[in-house]
């Protein structure tokens, strides 16, 4: 979520970006919150290690049609969903949002120009989260791009195996890919 007042929230995509974000935070003049999961850090996307710029996302792949924006350790899931969507024949961009706050409004405005659907993936409660912030921004700009937020509803989640729990709340590749295809088909029918 983004509700920490004047604290700037960042979430690294993998262990290399975690080290880069810690270095960035040391020199940053304002309070910074760095969210990372317990357990192992994602080992993928190592070749994508662009410099961290304040409030700016990292564009991993840029096309048109569908844009997937993941934040933090949802990088592995975001990458697998992106690959599955591409293999199904869709044009799709993949974006590492990096910052939950501040939102990279310049990039989102740019994505709205050539994407009909923006999908946000976060392992946070949707209410007050990153995806909700994207929805609000797109609505304020008057853009016609649709936004699908994928995350956790504001319900109690039992303690347990992380992969099982993610599947239960819809944070798995199969569920997300099916939702994206359904949403995109509805857009094309309009």
Predicted regions and their residues:
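Active-site core segments that coordinate phosphate-bearing ligands/cofactors
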Residues: 9, 23, 46-48
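Thiamine diphosphate
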Residues: 27-190
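Conserved glycine-bearing catalytic or ligand-binding loops at nucleotide- and phosphate-handling centers
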Residues: 11-26
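Flexible, glycine/proline-enriched loop segments at strand-loop-helix junctions
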Residues: 9-12, 166
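Short, small-residue-biased leader/transition segments that mark boundaries at the very start
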Residues: 1-8
């Amino acid at each position: 979520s983004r509700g920490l007042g004047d604290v700037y929230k960042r979430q690294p995509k993998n262990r290399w970006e975690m080290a880069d974000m810690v270095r960035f935070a040391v020199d940053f003049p304002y309070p910074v919150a760095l969210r990372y999961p317990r357990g192992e850090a994602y080992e993928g996307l190592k070749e994508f290690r662009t410099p961290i710029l304040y409030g700016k996302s990292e564009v991993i792949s840029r096309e048109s049609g569908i844009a997937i924006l993941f934040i933090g350790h949802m990088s592995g899931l975001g990458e697998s969903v992106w690959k599955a969507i591409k293999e199904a024949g869709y044009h799709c961009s993949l974006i590492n949002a990096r910052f939950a706050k501040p939102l990279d409004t310049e990039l989102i405005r740019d994505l709205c120009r050539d994407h009909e659907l923006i999908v946000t993936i976060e392992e946070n409660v949707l209410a007050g989260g990153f995806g909700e912030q994207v929805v609000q921004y797109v609505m304020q700009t008057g853009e016609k791009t649709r936004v699908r937020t994928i995350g956790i509803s504001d319900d109690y989640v039992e303690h347990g195996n992380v992969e099982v729990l993610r599947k239960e709340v819809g944070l798995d590749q199969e569920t997300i890919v099916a939702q994206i295809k359904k949403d995109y088909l509805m857009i094309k029918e309009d």
